[in-house]
C-alpha cells in the first residue's frame, strides 16, 4: 500500500508540474525566434535573451528557441549572452499592437581561439550537455559522458549512483544500499580502472585495485567520462573500460556556488536507528599503543562502543561550496570546491548460509536476520590552479582529498536450522551485535603541463603523487547465545549466555607515484595533417596492510564452570586468549608494483576518414611479502610479465554530425594485490577470503563498431556492438580449505567471450525530453566445476567421490539486460527541471561456486527515482530528490528446485525452482535543498 501511494504521489507531482508549464494561456503579442552558432548554425541551448532596460529576459529551450509573450506596446532592444560566445548585436523592434508577432534569429560568434596546443580563452560551457555531446562526437575513442548539469538535476549525489544512468553500466551496491562499484558492459569491476583528470588513482581497499565510487561526491565533478575503448596512448588495463572523473575548472569570470540540503530515509519511519558511542572506539590496538611485548587484558578494551541503543535517526546534512575566478587577463585560474554529506542509511537483511549436500543440492545451516544502521559522512576538498603563460605554454596544479566514514551498528539474529532443531520456531539462536567504523580516503596531487616546442610539435606531461587507504579500528561483534528449551511441550529459549568474540584492528595505506610524458608531431604530408605521438608512463606503487585480532573469552562462572549469563556490556568480564594479538595471522602483507609503459601512435585524416593506430607495451612487476613462515609455500613472491597491446580505431564521417566507428585493440587485467597473497582473512560477512599466488593476469582482444548521430547539440542516437575474447579471466569462487572452511578465492577460469550491443537515444520536444539506453550482453565462460558422484539408489557416493564437469556459464557480474529510461521536463522561463528516472538491471551471477549449478544469482532489479528543481530569481534554486521510490529489494538465490514443504523454512517458496539465499531492503531516501549561484 505504501509503495503504491509513493508511486501515485510522484506521478501526480510530475504531471502537475508539467501541466503548469504546458497549459499556458495563449498571448496575443509575441517576440520569438532562435539562437544559433554563427559558424556551425547549431542551436544554442540555455542562452540568455535580454530585453534591454527592462526586467524581461528568458533562456532558449532544448531546440534553441525563445519566446516573449504579451509585451506592452512600445520600442524595445534585445540582445543575447552566453558563456563562450560574444554578446550579440542589439536587435531593435516595436510592439505596435496587441496582436503583432515579431520573429528574429540571433547569430552568436564564439570567443574560442584554439591553437594546436593551448585553448587561450573562451569555450563552450564544459559543464553543459552540449559540451558532453560535442566531446563524444569528436573523441578519438568510444566514450559516453555525463555532464555536471545532468548530474545536478539527477536524483543522485554520489558518483557511484550517477554511473547507473550511463549506457552499459550497472552497479554493485554496498550493504547500506548505495551504489559502490561500476560494472561496464557486464565486465566485473576488476576489469575497469578509475582516473581523475586523466591520471589513474589508487584504491583505498585493503585487497583490491578497483576504486569504490561512493567515496566521491558528485557535486565537485565537471563531467564523468566512461571510455568504452582505449587507444595506444591510454593505459591498457581496460578490458571493460575506464572511468575518468574530470574535476571542476575555473571559468572565465567570478563564480560562487553554494548548496545546502537535508533529507531523511524512509527506512527509519518503521525502524529505530541503532547506535553506540563511536567516540569510544580506540584507533590503535593494545599492541600498537604499548609495543610488541605488551600483554593485553580485558580492561584494555572499551565497552561503550558495544552499548547499543535505539534512537531516532537525525536528518541529513548536505553542504557544498565552490568559488573560482580568473586573474591577470584571464591567465591565472583558481578554483576551490568542497563538499560535505552526512546521511543515515538503514537496511534489513535475511541470509541463509548454505552448504552442498551429498546429492548436489543446497542445504541450509542457519537463517540470519540482520538490522543495520549506518551513519555515512562523505567529505571532499578540491583545489585547482592553472596558469596560461602564452599561446604555447600552460601549467596546472590540482589536489583532491576525499573521505568516507561509515559508522555501522548491526544486530543479527542467527538461528540454527540443524542442531537441536525440531521444527518451525525452534533452534539455537546466536545474537551478534556489531560495531564497525570504517574510514576510506583518497588524496591526489597532480602537476600537469602543455608546451609547444616547435610550430608543429608539442608535448604534454603529468607528475602525480597519490595516497589511499582504509582504517577499521576496533571492529567488534558481541556474541551471545540462547539455546532451546521446552516449557510444557512449547518451544522456548534459555537465558542468553556470553560467548567468545574478537576485537579487530585493520588498516592499510597505498602510496603511488605516476609520471606521464607524451610528445606529438603534426606535420602536413601531401596536404593532409598527420599526428605522430610517442610517450611513456612509469608508476611505482607500494601497499602496506596491517591486521591484528584479539580473542576475548568470558570469564567462566559457577560450578561446573560455564559461560556466564549476559546482563549488560558493563557487567561482562573477559580474559584475552591471545594477549599479544594475532599479528601473524590474517591479511598482513606488503605489496609493490611497478609499471613501465611506452607507446607509438599515429593519427591520419583522409577526407572523411580518421585513422588512429599504434602499439603499446606494458611491463609489469608485482611482488609481495607476508607474515607467513618460510615453511608455507609462496609466503613471498613476485611475478613479471610484458604485454604488447596493438590497437586501431577508425572513424568515418558519413555526413555532418554522423560517425561510423570501428575499433580493435588488445587489453589486460592485472590480479588484485591480495589475489597473489596466500593468506586467509576470517569471515566478517558471509565468507572469508584466501589469496592464490598462482593466478594469472587476463588478456583480451576487443572489437567494437558504433554508429553515432547528433541531430542537435544535446541530442544523440547511438547503435553499437562489441565482442571481447578473454584468456584467463579472473573470478572469485567459493572453495573449501583443508580445514573445511568455505572461503572466496580468485581463480582463472579457462577462456571466455563477452559480446553484446548498445542502443542510446536522447531526444527533446521543446520543453519535454526523453533519454533512453539499452545494453544487451551475452557472455560464455568455459569452466571446470565439480560435483559429488552421488548414487540415488544407495544414497551414498560412488568412486571416485568427486567428478569434474566441463560446463559454461555467464561471466560473474554480467547482466544480460540493462536499461535506462528518463523523462524530462524543462521550462527555462519558469526555471523548472523535472526528471523521472528508471533503471533496470537484469539478473546476474554475484558469487561463483565450485559445484556445478550452485552459483549465487542476483535477481533482476528495477529502481525508480525522481528529482525536481525550481529556479527562484536569477541566483537561487530549490530542489527535491527521491531515490528508490519502489523500495526495490535485492534478492540472491540459487537456481535449484526447492524440495521442502511450505513452512519448513521461513521466506522460502515451496515448489519453487530456486532457494532464497539473501534478501536486502533499504527504503526510500528523500532529499531537499537550496542552491545559490553567483
Per-region residue spans from a language model:
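Short acidic/polar hinge/loop motifs at secondary-structure boundaries
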Residues: 171, 199-228, 248, 273-274
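Extracytoplasmic beta-strand/coil segments of soluble accessory domains associated
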Residues: 160-200, 223, 241-242
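Outer-membrane beta-barrel signature, preferentially recognizing the C-terminal barrel domain
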Residues: 424-448, 583-596, 668-726, 737-764, ...
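Transmembrane beta-barrel wall of Gram-negative outer-membrane proteins
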Residues: 30, 304-410, 443, 646-648
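C-terminal beta-signal and adjacent terminal beta-strands/loops
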Residues: 840-847, 870-934
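A beta-strand signature from Gram-negative outer-membrane beta-barrel systems
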Residues: 215-259
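Short, acidic, small-residue-rich periplasmic hinge/interaction motif at the N-terminus
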Residues: 36, 48-50, 81-83, 101-152, ...
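Gram-negative outer-membrane beta-barrel transporters
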Residues: 723-725, 743-844
Amino acid at each position: 500500500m505504501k509503495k503504491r501511494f509513493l508511486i501515485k504521489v510522484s506521478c501526480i507531482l510530475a504531471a502537475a508540474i508539467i501541466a503548469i508549464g504546458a497549459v499556458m494561456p495563449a498571448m496575443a503579442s509575441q517576440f520569438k525566434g532562435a539562437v544559433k552558432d554563427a559558424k556551425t548554425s547549431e542551436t544554442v541551448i540555455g542562452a540568455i535573451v535580454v530585453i534591454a532596460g527592462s526586467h524581461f529576459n528568458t533562456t532558449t529551450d532544448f531546440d534553441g528557441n525563445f519566446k516573449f509573450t504579451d509585451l506592452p506596446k512600445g520600442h524595445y532592444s534585445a540582445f543575447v549572452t552566453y558563456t563562450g560566445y560574444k554578446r550579440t548585436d542589439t536587435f531593435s523592434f516595436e510592439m505596435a499592437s496587441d496582436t503583432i508577432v515579431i520573429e528574429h534569429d540571433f547569430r552568436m560568434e564564439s570567443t574560442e581561439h584554439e591553437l594546436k596546443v593551448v585553448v587561450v580563452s573562451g569555450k563552450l560551457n564544459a559543464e553543459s550537455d552540449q559540451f558532453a555531446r560535442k566531446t563524444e562526437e569528436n573523441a578519438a575513442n568510444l566514450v559516453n559522458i555525463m555532464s555536471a548539469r545532468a548530474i545536478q538535476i539527477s536524483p543522485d549525489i554520489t558518483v557511484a549512483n550517477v554511473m547507473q544512468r550511463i549506457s552499459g553500466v550497472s552497479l554493485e551496491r554496498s550493504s547500506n544500499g548505495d551504489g559502490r562499484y561500476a560494472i561496464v558492459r557486464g565486465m566485473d569491476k576488476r576489469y575497469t580502472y578509475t582516473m581523475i583528470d586523466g591520471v589513474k588513482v589508487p584504491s583505498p581497499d585493503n585487497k583490491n585495485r578497483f576504486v569504490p565510487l561512493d567515496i566521491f561526491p558528485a557535486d565537485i565533478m565537471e563531467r564523468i567520462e566512461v571510455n568504452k575503448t582505449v587507444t595506444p596512448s591510454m593505459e591498457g588495463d581496460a578490458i571493460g573500460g575506464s572511468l575518468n572523473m574530470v574535476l571542476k575548472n575555473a571559468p572565465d569570470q567570478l563564480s560562487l556556488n553554494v548548496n545546502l540540503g537535508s533529507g531523511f530515509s524512509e527506512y527509519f519511519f518503521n525502524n529505530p536507528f541503532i547506535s553506540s558511542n563511536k567516540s569510544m572506539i580506540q584507533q590503535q590496538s593494545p599492541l600498537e599503543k604499548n609495543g610488541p611485548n605488551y600483554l593485553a587484558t580485558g580492561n584494555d578494551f572499551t565497552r561503550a562502543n558495544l552499548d547499543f541503543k535505539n534512537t531516532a535517526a537525525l536528518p541529513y546534512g548536505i553542504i557544498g561550496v565552490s568559488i573560482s575566478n580568473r586573474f591577470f587577463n584571464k591567465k591565472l585560474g583558481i578554483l576551490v570546491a568542497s563538499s560535505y554529506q552526512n546521511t543515515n542509511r538503514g537496511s534489513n537483511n535475511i541470509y541463509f548460509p548454505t552448504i552442498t549436500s551429498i546429492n548436489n543440492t543446497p542445504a541450509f545451516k542457519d537463517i540470519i536476520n540482520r538490522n543495520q544502521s549506518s551513519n555515512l559522512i562523505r567529505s571532499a576538498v578540491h583545489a585547482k590552479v592553472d596558469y596560461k603563460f602564452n599561446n604555447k605554454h600552460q601549467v596546472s596544479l590540482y589536489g583532491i582529498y576525499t573521505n568516507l566514514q561509515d559508522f555501522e551498528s548491526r544486530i543479527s539474529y542467527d538461528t540454527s536450522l540443524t542442531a537441536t532443531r525440531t521444527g518451525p520456531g525452534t533452534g539455537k539462536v546466536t545474537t551478534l551485535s556489531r560495531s564497525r567504523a570504517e574510514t576510506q580516503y583518497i588524496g591526489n596531487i597532480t602537476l600537469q603541463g602543455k608546451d609547444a616546442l616547435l610550430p608543429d610539435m608539442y608535448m604534454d606531461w603529468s607528475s602525480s603523487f597519490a595516497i589511499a587507504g582504509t582504517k577499521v579500528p576496533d571492529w567488534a561483534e558481541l556474541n551471545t547465545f540462547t539455546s532451546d528449551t521446552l516449557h510444557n511441550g512449547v518451544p522456548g529459549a534459555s537465558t542468553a549466555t556470553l560467548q567468545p568474540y574478537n576485537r579487530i584492528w585493520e588498516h592499510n595505506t597505498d602510496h603511488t607515484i605516476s609520471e606521464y610524458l607524451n610528445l606529438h608531431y603534426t606535420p602536413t604530408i601531401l596536404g593532409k595533417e598527420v599526428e605522430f605521438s610517442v610517450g611513456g608512463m612509469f608508476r611505482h606503487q607500494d601497499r602496506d596492510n596491517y591486521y591484528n585480532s584479539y580473542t576475548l573469552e568470558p570469564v567462566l562462572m559457577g560450578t561446573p564452570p560455564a559461560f556466564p549469563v549476559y546482563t549488560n556490556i558493563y557487567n561482562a568480564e573477559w580474559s584475552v586468549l591471545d594477549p599479544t594479538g594475532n599479528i601473524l595471522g590474517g591479511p598482513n602483507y606488503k605489496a609493490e608494483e611497478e609499471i613501465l609503459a611506452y607507446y607509438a601512435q599515429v593519427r591520419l585524416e583522409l577526407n572523411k576518414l580518421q585513422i588512429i593506430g599504434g602499439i603499446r607495451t606494458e611491463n609489469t612487476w608485482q611482488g609481495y611479502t607476508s607474515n607467513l613462515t618460510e615453511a608455507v609455500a609462496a609466503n613471498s613472491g613476485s611475478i613479471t610479465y610484458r604485454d604488447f597491446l596493438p590497437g586501431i580505431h577508425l572513424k568515418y564521417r558519413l555526413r555532418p554530425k554522423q560517425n561510423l566507428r570501428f575499433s580493435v585493440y588488445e587489453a589486460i587485467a592485472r590480479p588484485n594485490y591480495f589475489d597473489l597473497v596466500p593468506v586467509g582473512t576470517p569471515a566478517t560477512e558471509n565468507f572469508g577470503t584466501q589469496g592464490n599466488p598462482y593466478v594469472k593476469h587476463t588478456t583480451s582482444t576487443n572489437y567494437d563498431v558504433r554508429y553515432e548521430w547528433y541531430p542537435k547539440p544535446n541530442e544523440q542516437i547511438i547503435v553499437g556492438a562489441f565482442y571481447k575474447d578473454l584468456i584467463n579471466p579472473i573470478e572469485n569462487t567459493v572453495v573449501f580449505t583443508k580445514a573445511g572452511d568455505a572461503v572466496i578465492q580468485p581463480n582463472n577460469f579457462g577462456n571466455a567471450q563477452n559480446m553484446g550491443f548498445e542502443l542510446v537515444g536522447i531526444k527533446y520536444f521543446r520543453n519535454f525530453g526523453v533519454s533512453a539506453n539499452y545494453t544487451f550482453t551475452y557472455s560464455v565462460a568455459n569452466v571446470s566445476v565439480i560435483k559429488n558422484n552421488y548414487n540415488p539408489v544407495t544414497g551414498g557416493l560412488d568412486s571416485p567421490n568427486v567428478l569434474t564437469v566441463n560446463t559454461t556459464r555467464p561471466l560473474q557480474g554480467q547482466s544480460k539486460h540493462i536499461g535506462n529510461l528518463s523523462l524530462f521536463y524543462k521550462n527555462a522561463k519558469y526555471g523548472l527541471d523535472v526528471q523521472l528516472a528508471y533503471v533496470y538491471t537484469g539478473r546476474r551471477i554475484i558469487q561463483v561456486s565450485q559445484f556445478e549449478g550452485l552459483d549465487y544469482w542476483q535477481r533482476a532489479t528495477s529502481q525508480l527515482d525522481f528529482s525536481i528543481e525550481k529556479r527562484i530569481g536569477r541566483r537561487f534554486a530549490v530542489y527535491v530528490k527521491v531515490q528508490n521510490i519502489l523500495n526495490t529489494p535485492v534478492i540472491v538465490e540459487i537456481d535449484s528446485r526447492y524440495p521442502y514443504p511450505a513452512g519448513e523454512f521461513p521466506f522460502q517458496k515451496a515448489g519453487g525452482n530456486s532457494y532464497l539465499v539473501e534478501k536486502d531492503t533499504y527504503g526510500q531516501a528523500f532529499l531537499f535543498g537550496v542552491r545559490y549561484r553567483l
